[in-house]
């Protein structure tokens, strides 16, 4: 908002000089680059993790306990605020973390960088992808997959030639929603 006001008020005329000065700053360029890197990485990882959880829930037969555990684990980040997940990562995997220091004996671990942010953001946002992709997988016509199986296709071939192409718009949507968040 201040940039917009300065672009009008600066010398009395509207101009883009203030924006040129801001975009020329190396720290601003680095911040934008890091933001885009984190966004793309988190979008891709969240979509893949959401796809994995949705696929297992819809297609894989698991016991009631494992299925219930899967649902709880996938929905837990939705009901807890993101700062709780961040704090949990710090308490478990930080320099004095329970897992890093006491179980693994690692004393110089840092979760405050690029990868720590990417992991926490992925764990925070993948349930959104999971819910979107689960609905998509449930609505795929099973007769299309059965026809491919009847023609002799393996499970992998059915997934790559029937299921995945039908899911590509939903995967793109899940990526974009996560990237924007």
Regions from the PLM with identified roles:
Residues 41, 149-150:
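Charged/polar positions on well-ordered alpha helices
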Residues 140-143:
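Short glycine/proline-centered loop/turn elements that form peptide/ligand docking sites
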Residues 14-23:
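A short amphipathic helical element positioned immediately N-terminal to and/or at the very start
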Residues 1-12, 26-138, 162-181:
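Membrane-water interface segments at the C-terminal ends of transmembrane alpha-helices
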């Amino acid at each position: 908002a201040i940039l917009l006001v300065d672009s009008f008020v600066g010398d009395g005329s509207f101009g883009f000089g203030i924006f040129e000065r801001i975009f020329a700053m190396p720290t601003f360029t680095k911040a934008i680059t890091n933001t885009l890197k984190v966004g793309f990485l988190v979008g891709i990882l969240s979509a893949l993790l959401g796809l994995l959880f949705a696929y297992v829930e819809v297609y894989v037969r698991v016991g009631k306990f494992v299925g219930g555990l899967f649902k709880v684990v996938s929905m837990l980040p939705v009901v807890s605020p993101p700062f709780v997940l961040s704090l949990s990562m710090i308490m478990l995997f930080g320099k004095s973390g329970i897992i890093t220091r006491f179980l693994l004996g690692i004393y110089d671990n840092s979760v405050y960088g690029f990868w720590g942010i990417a992991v926490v953001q992925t764990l925070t946002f993948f349930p959104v992808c999971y819910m979107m992709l689960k609905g998509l997988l449930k609505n795929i016509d099973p007769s299309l997959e059965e026809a491919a199986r009847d023609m002799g296709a393996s499970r992998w071939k059915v997934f790559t030639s029937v299921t995945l192409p039908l899911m590509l718009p939903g995967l793109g949507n899940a990526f974009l929603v996560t990237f924007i968040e």
